[in-house]
Amino acid sequence: MDSSDIQRTSIAVIGGGLVGSLNACFLAKRNFQVDVYESREDIRMAEFARGRSINLALSYRGRQALKAIGLEDQIVSQGIPMRARMIHSLSGKKSAIPYGTKSQYILSISRENLNKDLLTAVEKYPNAKVHFGHQLLKCRPETGVITLLGPDKVPKDIACDLILGCDGAYSTVRTHLVKKPRFDYSQQYIPHGYMELTIPPQNGDFAMEPNYLHIWPRDTFMMIALPNMNKSFTCTLFMPFEEFEKLLTSRDVLDFFQKYFPDSLHLIGKEALAQDFFRLPAQPMISVKCSSFHFNSHCVLMGDAAHALVPFFGQGMNAGFEDCLVFDELMDKFNNDFSMCLPEFSKFRIPDDHAISDLSMYNYIEMRSHVNSRWFIFQKNIERCLHTLMPSTFIPLYTMVTFSRIRYHEAMLRWQWQKKVINTALFFFGTLVALSTTYLLTGPTFRSSLGCLRRSWNSVTYFQNIGRISL
């Protein structure tokens, strides 16, 4: 293609989702010319928005990124605080496990509404534009040239100073980087899928306590429910695919819920459950890791394109938003020099994003199984007690991840150390209690037996001395 056909822009953001639109705001604030290319239609105009609809849990890292572009208050006002997990046992008993102190909470946020607000925020910058219906065909990170297919169905080359790949877990930008030398990539589909259901309002109000993340843990699977602003709850059933495949009829589904989630059955409604369960098949969940996140000084990956997470720590969006914030901080540090900023971004974020990926996998086991354990709850209480007594020394993992900007990999290392300290202390304490109990229970008997042995030995010695027996 002739060079005269190439239109020069400064920054091309591929993907107009959450991370792409937030990144566009950060970069537009720096007076770059920013063009966002989104393959979907404008979700603000669409009658039905395609894509994922899992509710999001907005926490400190994400809020700090929104604060940096002046959107925190607007977004927070549209969320519902969740201060604890509400555990629903099989018997119907409910118990709360606080996330942190009374002032600490996460927010249940609508993915769709947040994306709409971020797109609107991008368009308020005169130097930023969102192009809908533009599919990325080719990416040449060596030169900063991308080929797009727009609504006119004519491929078009665009050159830019920087390509930001924010196009999700199945990133097209990343597929071009994978072909480059020394670019490592791995993906893992977990054996569990998810399905969304709804608990509607009852009598114009929430059907359950609204300020909780409700969990029905059942060891190998679980269901959760997050509150919505319209007083409904979005329920998500996470379960191995083979279990989904066993539920073939409405009767199977109703019997399954009656057995494992009996208190939710009347909340969802039998008729609605029987219909909604078969509306869409269970969806897969993928975990993606790659290294590095950049190529030369022309291309960088962020969000799910760099590190797709399973959703069990509620950090997918928050980690992606923190990517944007860290990149913005590095741009300050290196005075907008991409050749310095991009390598440092990879060096800084890869350990953190790999750590939160591993922690997200672990947290699924905790949510579906460990929360049923009295020992787990006992350990959580010990952690909270130690954190109260020594707030700067002992910090619970969830607090570090959700209510601070402690780097993810540092939080994981610190958590592992704290677990060793607590387990060692509990072992010695348990041993001391066992020895003390043994002494109290057997002490008199032990002393009596010792006295008998002493008298017997004295008798033997006496007879030996007078020559009546020989040993």
Curated annotation (Swiss-Prot):
* Binding, L-kynurenine: R85, Y99, N363, Y398
Q: How does it sit in the membrane?
A: Multi-pass membrane protein
Where are the coiled-coil regions?
Answer: none
In short, the EC number is 1.14.13.9
UniProt keywords (A-Z) are:
FAD, Flavoprotein, Membrane, Mitochondrion, Mitochondrion outer membrane, Monooxygenase, NADP, Oxidoreductase, Pyridine nucleotide biosynthesis, Transmembrane, Transmembrane helix
Instruction: Tell me which family the UniProt entry assigns to this protein.
Output: Belongs to the aromatic-ring hydroxylase family. KMO subfamily.
Per the record, the domain comment is: Transmembrane domains are required for enzymatic activity.
Do you know which PANTHER family this protein is assigned to? KYNURENINE 3-MONOOXYGENASE
- For this entry, the protein name equals Kynurenine 3-monooxygenase
Q: What species is given as this protein's source?
A: Sus scrofa (Pig)
What gene is this protein a product of?
A: KMO
